[in-house]
Amino acid sequence: MSQYRFPIRILTRFYTQASSRLPPKSLLIKQADRIRRSKDGQADGSKLMVSSLKDIASMFQANAETPEDEEREILNQQNYLRQQIESGELERLLQDKFNLDESISLMSTNLLVQQFPKLNAQQVELIQEAVSMDSNKHWNEIPQYMKQLQFYFAFGSHGPRLSIPFNSREKPLDFAFKIPSPVTTDGQTKIHKLKPSHLVNLHTITDQRSKIFQTTKLDPATRCILWSAILVSIVFGVQEWRLQQDPQAKITVLSNSV
């Protein structure tokens, strides 16, 4: 009996040590990137599942990157972007793409809406780093064009808000309420729930947004794989529970297998 328990203990110890390892940041970044690409229609559910399994398997490889390596890589990239900003690369990019006028410290709003979706990943990352750097400053110390970028990142026509008109003088189409709720402090006004006709379906504002939410659904092949994995996990879980409840059954199974 002891000769069978010994390898089981080793396997249990190895599984415990491996499962206690924290997932590296690269895995989280890759998963976030795949979700974004799947929403844009660039990947289907099956490819997403296969890619996720590959990343999980890479965690157990001897040459896999550690969390410290990931943090060092992110820090180096951040330092590189800040050096680019300090060298004036950001201003040159904004002047070229959005017609930045340094005399009034403003950009063309129309160009911002039209040209921003055409930027490549490196250019967007440079702008995002600049916006994050200025977010800690006092509002009066932030340049006007950086305020424009902050406002665009918060409310502009990009990502899920793609194809929604960007006009600061009008209420956005995806505003939650068609009729705004009044503010009351007298304690006498009755509060009631808004009718469905007074609400906006945020999922069907535009065709582009509707497609984004449709692509998040799992295809039949992925659902089949997922339910199969759940079923196998339940079966093995029940068998493991039965073995733990009846030690004699474990001895019988091992002795019969010899």
From Swiss-Prot:
Q: How does it sit in the membrane?
A: Single-pass membrane protein
Name the residues that span the membrane.
221-238
Protein role? Involved in respiratory growth and required for cell survival in the absence of prohibitins.
**Transit peptide extent on chain:** 1-15
Q: Of which family is this protein a member?
A: Belongs to the GEP7 family.
Q: What is this protein called?
A: Genetic interactor of prohibitin 7, mitochondrial
Q: Does the keyword Nucleotide-binding apply?
A: no
Annotated source species: Zygosaccharomyces rouxii (strain ATCC 2623 / CBS 732 / NBRC 1130 / NCYC 568 / NRRL Y-229)
| CC annotations in GO | mitochondrial membrane
Instruction: Tell me the classification of the organism that encodes this protein.
Output: Eukaryota, Fungi, Dikarya, Ascomycota, Saccharomycotina
The entry's keywords: Membrane, Mitochondrion, Transit peptide, Transmembrane, Transmembrane helix
Localization (cell): Mitochondrion membrane
